[in-house]
A protein has these predicted regions:
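Mature, well-folded catalytic/scaffold domains that follow N-terminal targeting or propeptide regions
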Residues: 1-342
């Protein structure tokens, strides 16, 4: 009716939506032949434009186009230390150089993460989100390479008490720890299925991750323990992907109703997801879905209801991942039925 509605949002609230718009735009390009100068020519100076171009870089990386990005242009993107641009570039490079162990790409990742700098280096005080992207980018570059040194450094960041960062120490720490867990899992992707994991180093790593997942919240700072537990579960999910390791699955199993007070409900989602990915035996049936939780719908018992839905949500996500690309009608129908679960 001619009324002008003015926006009440802050400018920064649109940064991530613009970032995702940029990713979508780049994905439309497909296999087009692009070069370094063409990519850099699309950069923008406006706030929304910078966020959108950051996502554009990630989208190009998903297509592998950032292999053609010159080193000079890469460092021109990194020099202003704009967080979203760095995140988009680092993850895009990681996707473009997936599993190659490329030395130049690794150098870009390592510069973003204080934990990967040589001893005695001048602290760069990167933001926590930038360092989280660097960790995940490192995992992508060394995906399924079993590169032991990189894996060791990533494992050390799962429970790092302090991070040399420009932010308040707790800002985005969950993203940092989860990125370390995912990156560690990527470096050793499917290792438990590909090898016997019989070395002492492998045993030590598995025991460490399983112990972190199972640590009760009362034994240390609740937030730090929960953060490490979730990151360790993600690492186990990828490291033992479809391996059928029952010992690892047992460590990830949901607690009994009597022990629900010792674990946050959201951690149950991650553990349920990881357990299903480790076993790899998901089937699109109500029987399988019911088997993922030790009790049936708890009615009005709120703590048990929260746990029940989180465990079920993790199982549904795992089913979607394991059946991705199959166009399985039974899996689709089962997941749609969960939307009306009461």
């Amino acid at each position: 009716h001619g009324t002008v509605v003015s926006g009440t949002h802050e400018a920064h609230e649109l940064d991530w939506p613009e970032f995702h718009n940029g990713v979508a735009s780049a994905l439309e390009i497909g296999a087009a032949n692009v070069d370094s100068s063409w990519i850099f020519a699309h950069a923008s100076a406006s706030r929304g434009g910078r966020a959108r171009h950051a996502g554009f870089l990630l989208g190009l990386g998903l297509h592998g186009h950032l292999r053609r990005l010159g080193r000079v242009h890469a460092y021109r993107y990194l020099a202003p230390r704009h967080v979203l641009t760095t995140v988009g570039l680092v993850l895009g490079l990681g996707a473009s150089f997936l599993g190659t162990g490329d030395a130049a790409a690794r150098q870009v990742m390592a510069v973003q993460v204080a934990a990967f700098l040589p001893p005695g280096s001048v602290p760069l005080h990167m933001s926590t989100m930038t360092q989280a992207a660097g960790l995940l980018g490192m995992g992508l570059v060394f995906c399924q390479t079993d590169h032991a040194w990189t894996a060791m450094r990533l494992a050390s960041q799962l429970d790092a008490p302090m991070v040399d960062t420009a932010d308040a120490n707790e800002a985005h720490r969950d993203a940092y720890a989860h990125s370390a867990g995912l990156a560690l899992g990527l470096v050793y992707l499917g290792r438990a299925r590909r090898t016997s994991m019989s070395s002492s180093a492998d045993h030590t790593l598995l025991e460490r991750l399983c112990r972190a997942v199972a640590t009760p919240l009362g034994e240390a700072s609740g937030m730090a323990v929960a953060r490490t537990a979730a990151a360790s579960a993600l690492a186990l999910a990828l490291l033992c992907l479809r391996s059928g390791r029952r010992d690892v699955a047992e460590a990830l199993a949901p607690p009994t109703p009597a022990n629900l007070a010792h674990i946050r409900p959201d951690l149950l989602l991650v553990r349920s997801l990881a357990r299903a990915l480790v076993l790899g035996d998901a089937s699109p049936s109500d029987e399988w879905l019911d088997s993922t939780c030790a009790w049936t719908h708890p009615g009005d018992d709120v703590p048990r209801a929260l746990a029940f839905y989180q465990i079920r949500a993790g199982a549904c996500l795992a089913l979607g991942l394991l059946y991705a690309g199959r166009a399985d009608e039974r899996a689709r129908a089962l997941l749609l039925r969960q939307l009306s679960l009461e």
